[in-house]
Amino acid sequence: VGSEMCIRDSKVSVYPIEEKTSFVVKDTRYTLDSLIRNRKIARHFQGGYAVILRLTVDDYHRYCYFDDGIKSENHRINGVYHTVNPIANDHVKIYKENTREYTLMKTKHFGDALQMEVGALMVGKIVNHDGAGSMRRGIEKGYFQFGGSTIILLLEKDKVEIREELLERTKNQCETKIRQGEMIGKALV
């Protein structure tokens, strides 16, 4: 069970990370460099996977660690809060970025990973409980205050085998609804 990656209730998309990979989070297109604002970290995850977990109002807004290991301090990237309402975005075309926090992790089963929380309007508050130190699978890492938000996991090359159907559905621009405890992928040992 420890070698299976299980996250939380959400709508999931999984992208192979290549040089030009980009994806949309909260109506903003990001490359790995623009998402993390750290080219060295972005390069470290080349060839791996970006797992995007979109939470909606019907999802539980607390999130847990997906494996045991050691974590860094939380790194905050300030953004400008804007609504994710498509009607508002159609009338006011402006550059926007959401506030993000990420944690670097050395996991027991999945190698190096990065977990990022992304907040939006009315969900601007990301609350992470702990600083650097140990982490345990299934223990709450933090929560979003009010409404829907997004969690992004970056995983190293050759460390995890993602369920093929998730990759296929993402390729066809479809999210997959998953539940807490449902397997996303397995560690490659």
Segments (PLM) and residue ranges:
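Short, small-residue-biased leader/transition segments that mark boundaries at the very start
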Residues: 2-7
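A residue-level detector for short acidic-glycine micro-motifs
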Residues: 12-14, 73, 117, 142-143
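Acidic, glycine-rich catalytic/binding loops that coordinate metals and/or anionic ligands
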Residues: 104, 159-189
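Short, compositionally biased
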Residues: 28-30, 86-91, 151-164
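Short, well-structured beta-strand-loop connectors
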Residues: 65, 69-73, 132-144, 174-188
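Glycine/small-residue-rich hydrophobic helix-like segments
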Residues: 108-153
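Generic structural motif
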Residues: 10-12, 67-70, 121, 138, ...
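Cytosolic, membrane-proximal regulatory domains of ion/volume homeostasis and mechanosensation machinery
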Residues: 22-50, 55-60, 66, 74-126
